[in-house]
Amino acid sequence: MMPSTLQTLAKKTLATQHISKKYWPSEEYCYILKCCGLWWHDSPITIFTCIKQILIKTANFKHGLDLNLALMKAVQENNYELIMLFTEWGADINLGLITVNTECTRDLCQKLGAKEALSAKEILEIFYKIQYIKSSNNIIISHELISNHPLFLNNDQLKLRIVGELNAISINFILDEISFNEMLTRYWYSMAILYKLPAAIQYFYQSYKYFKDWRLICSLAYNNVFDLHEIYNKEKTDINIDEMMRLACRYDGNYTTIYYCFMLGADINQAMITSVMNLWDGNLFLCIDLGADVFEECMKIAIEDHNGVLESILSFKNYYSPDVSLLSLKTTDPEKINDLLDEDIYKSKNRLIYKSC
């Protein structure tokens, strides 16, 4: 029998309360929480809302776990009380079909409203639903529940999506030569770096050391200068400085990692060419600020691509000059680089000149 709405509300209210040191970890308080079913992995369950999403916190999930992922984990563990609780709080019971492993648990999920089975389209939608939740716990649990799961491994549309994502940054392995399981693992690893989640980054780094240079590659491509600095100084890499710069120029606005590579000695003129080839005007202006001057070669590329915007920018070459404030810093300290070139702070001197012309 499902609990009443009042019971559900009472449990939810209790789970949102701050636990005072006066009562925690008292036996009485623990007893109340256990009686209410607000207990998981030998610790209390608390909830909080982040951007309209309910996140579950326990001692094991200190960074917060999305309610739907928490349901999937509870189903995997055959924890009937929590399956019911998370469903009452709004989790989609259909996601439980991903991790169900006994007939009794499947029966419970279906009694709570789950379908008989999920279509390939619904499997893909589940992936989309959980992939953008930015916490270390979410990234790690998503990887553990999905990366080796047949429902996801056999989804052709998901494979196309992941191949597209990895193709954008893969340079030291051929996608056709690795399994889809490894592709998914590399994908979740890259998301940890993109979202700048130290705990998740360390989890993947320790678990998948044989992914040679992957952490460095993702740090460059996703503009995570702090992680780039850490891994570059921690391990020897087979990737040369100019190749690192090419990766940093992969996406527009990667100002901190471009600058970091420049400080290591990468060719800023080649970076300017790469930026034009990728059609990134933001990176182009940074390269000009850092002294790049291969305007004629870049103009040829812009003309061949019929890119009027870049042609216009490059045509004002006689008005541009290096930005002394950027060149005088001369540091690989990620904190200082970030303060100088954070995307929300940095305003290109030469872009301002271009706009005034």
UniProtKB/Swiss-Prot annotation:
Pfam families: ASFV_360. The lineage of its organism: Viruses, Varidnaviria, Bamfordvirae, Nucleocytoviricota, Pokkesviricetes. It comes from the Viruses. It comes from African swine fever virus (isolate Tick/Malawi/Lil 20-1/1983). The keyword Lipid metabolism does not apply. Plays a role in virus cell tropism, and may be required for efficient virus replication in macrophages. One of its GO terms (biological process) is taxis. Belongs to the asfivirus MGF 360 family. InterPro entries: ASFV_MGF360. This is Protein MGF 360-22R. Keywords: ANK repeat. The keyword Disulfide bond does not apply. ANK repeats lie at residues 66-98.
